[in-house]
Design a protein with these regions (language model features):
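Extended, charge-rich alpha-helical interface modules
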Residues: 2-70
Length: 70
């Protein structure tokens, strides 16, 4: 039982990380006013970090689903 609580916790943490990455990409692409005083370099770095975080979250969720389907 505890094993599945750990998996449930990992799933929820990763889902939250995915939502954070999606929100960041949304702010960067659809709400330029939210960017503020960031330089172009900061903008690109933030976008790159967000897309990598999104890909990592998707990979983790896929792995959890493969080995511990709901």
């Amino acid at each position: 039982m505890a094993q599945y609580r750990v998996i449930k916790m990992l799933r929820k943490i990763t889902e939250a990380q995915k939502e954070k990455a999606l929100m960041t990409l949304e702010l960067l692409t659809e709400n330029p006013a939210g960017i503020g005083d960031h330089s172009t370099h900061d903008f690109y770095n933030n976008a790159e970090e967000a897309i990598k975080a999104l890909a990592e979250a998707d990979d983790v969720l896929d792995t959890i689903e493969r080995y511990y389907p709901e």
